[in-house]
Amino acid sequence: MTQDERREYLIQYLLKEEIPFGRQNIPTDRQGQENLLRSLMNVRPPRPISNDFLKIQDEYLTERNIERGITDVDTLAPVKSDSRLYIWQGDITTLKCDAIVNACNSQMLGCFSPMHACIDNFIHTYAGMELRLKMHEIMAKQGHEEETGKAKITSGYNLPTKYILHTVGPIIQWKVTKEDEDLLASCYTECLKLAADTGVESIAFCCLSTGVFRFPQQRAAEIAT
């Protein structure tokens, strides 16, 4: 199958799952099809899916992620003050390293808003549907929503990274409290503990809680370091 054929197969499969979606016209241009496929993947609940679909999805995403560009962490230069620390600005889903960190909500199932620009959406989109299925399995076994400041680990699936660490940061309601600061610090330490237990040697953190969770960026950076 060509990449175009894979994309069209995946779209047709997902549209046929839901009758309302099935009546939607499929765009003829590549960008329109990519946006539609991403949207369909974003909104799909964590229910069983065929092995044939997953095989073609994995082939599609493997090539798609190569097309998007991959940055190997080994090619980056550390900061002058600490040879273990790197500062990099870019799309974390394109990093080739041992682990990347995902900023999640307490359901831990990824972002269900079509085409949303959050990191949770990007990671689930380019990792593939196996990630949502795995997180559903983990959370069903846990039996309750994820606590703030804790972390889980999964495979990276179709991403260049080996693993994904999932953590829930504090949500700031009015002003930052000591508890908020402690919980944010816990996100980092819990991820590092899981990474060490798994043998991870390189880990890429995104900014935690500084987006829609409203943690002030300067203070969050101080806590992270």
Describe the predicted segments one by one.
Residues M1-T225:
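Macrodomain-like recognition of ADP-ribose-binding/processing modules
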